[in-house]
């Protein structure tokens, strides 16, 4: 069995987030002052986690967020970030740069509702989901290949320290599962991956995990909580399990969804 952890973080706040302006892919807005503080708070929260791989969308707000996270890390300060366009936000076409209220008005005029409505030049939800699936399958193949190489050239079993570094910081509660499912007979994590992306993208990825992978989620979470947009720097953690040989889809367990305890005090205006 090959197991790995996937920690997904939304970028920090931008000025346009606060003003409820659609950014999508075409408006490459930097983080606001609050956004930088959120990224730093996320970094402090994750500072003891030993990530083996770090990926980010190639848009400015995610680049600045992942940098803010890693500069607080005890173990990952010098880690190379792989920027991937497949992690970009949903493309909103003509709605980019316009208020969210206008997007909702466009949807209403078309007899549809957000987020299912696709503005002209935008990306459909199915296209967004396929993009997320493509990245996830690439990631799985990368981890399986590296795990196979490590198994071939090293007699050492996967280390339990990757998992313990996660288990120590993610508190149990309403948004968290009760365990990482790591009993004595379960191998340690082969990898611990950090991904920094965007609100609509992460919501689509959650839908893929729920409907396609039949991922188990914390029982206390409602369907509406699973489909809501993550807060800025909200964190969602999955454990993926591949049976020996790595054939077929992995089984997936969600440890927590849109965790935001690290933001206590950060978002308060003085």
From Swiss-Prot:
Gene Ontology cellular component terms for the protein in this record: cytoplasm; cytosol; mitochondrial outer membrane; mitochondrion; nucleus
Keyword Zinc: no
Modified residues (N6-acetyllysine): 50
Pfam families tied to this protein: His_Phos_1
Chemical reaction(s) catalysed: beta-D-fructose 2,6-bisphosphate + H2O = beta-D-fructose 6-phosphate + phosphate
Superkingdom: Eukaryota
Zinc among keywords: no
Residues of the active site: 11 (tele-phosphohistidine intermediate), 89 (proton donor/acceptor)
Main function: Fructose-bisphosphatase hydrolyzing fructose-2,6-bisphosphate as well as fructose-1,6-bisphosphate. Acts as a negative regulator of glycolysis by lowering intracellular levels of fructose-2,6-bisphosphate in a p53/TP53-dependent manner, resulting in the pentose phosphate pathway (PPP) activation and NADPH production. Contributes to the generation of reduced glutathione to cause a decrease in intracellular reactive oxygen species (ROS) content, correlating with its ability to protect cells from oxidative or metabolic stress-induced cell death.
Protein family membership: Belongs to the phosphoglycerate mutase family.
Annotated protein name in UniProt: Fructose-2,6-bisphosphatase TIGAR
Gene name for this UniProt entry: TIGAR
